[in-house]
Amino acid sequence: GEVRVSASLRVDGDLRCDALQCSGSAKIEGALSCAGEVRCSGSVKVADEAAMQEGRFSGSVKAQSLHCTGTLQCSGSAKSEGGMQLGKARFSGSCAAEGDIHAEELEIAGSLRAPAVEAERFHASGVFRIDGLLNAGEITLSRGGLYQAGDIGCTTLRVVQDAHVISLGRRKRALEAQSIEGDTLELLDTQAAVVRGRFVCVGAGCVIDRVEYSEDLTVEDGGIVKEPVRC
């Protein structure tokens, strides 16, 4: 059935339900399994896995691992001591995972921190720090954000100018990575040791130590490539 929490709830074992609405505080000592939507404007803590079809978090959710097969919208806080398995997710609040994140589509308008991320489509306009690999088919990054990744693998990556952001002098590059590899790469405000691609465009604010390209390399608007190599 449906569970509503407006004050406080403590469950010593697992909680199974069709829907969960929490505007108060819920603590589940086992796992949470929800066949429908979990809606949280309060606080939910789950000792084991939190699994749901849909999720809408404006409060805080913390679990050992998070699994959402459908759509997840988080304007609050989502934390996982393990990994996250997501369908289509949008974080305008904060997302922190100590394990890897796997998603079909991931949009970061707030902040994200994870060891590694894999997605079919990845879009960011906020802040992220990915210690290891960001692997996605299509990556779009707004120039107004701040992004750090160990390595990036993709089919296409575009750093695009945000029409609503006027650069008045940056503290640091928009994107920093050790290596970036893909078919089509369009870079702005990017610092990387190695960039590998078929079609590579290095634009304003870029400092790239080495570019290895197979088809075409374009350097424009003051972008810097220290060592271009056609492979």
Locations of regions flagged by a protein language model:
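Extended beta-solenoid/beta-helix repeat architectures
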Residues: 1-231
